[in-house]
Amino acid sequence: MNGLPVRNGGDDVLCLFLEPYGDVFWLKPGDEFTVLPGEGVPDPQFTVEMVKHRLIVWVFEGGDPAKVVVDCTVVDSGGNELPEGHQWPDGRSPY
């Protein structure tokens, strides 16, 4: 399955912000997660936008902006599914 690997190569936590629902996952320095579209999504295409301390990810079916993929999973480097809000640091906002 087509997935988007995301790695935090910085020295501070990084927020992975998954649209369209705004699900957030926090990567500590050195962490690597992968965004996986739901089963059966044909030709998933990823769009990534970087803003301060945040990566915003959209997934589209076949690259069509009218076909937003809403069923996605985020896994760690061991393949373990991560819950929304994973590693959310105290006092940090994704905005």
Walk through the language-model features, giving the residues of each.
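Asparagine-centered strand-capping/turn motif at beta-strand->loop junctions
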Residues: N2-G10
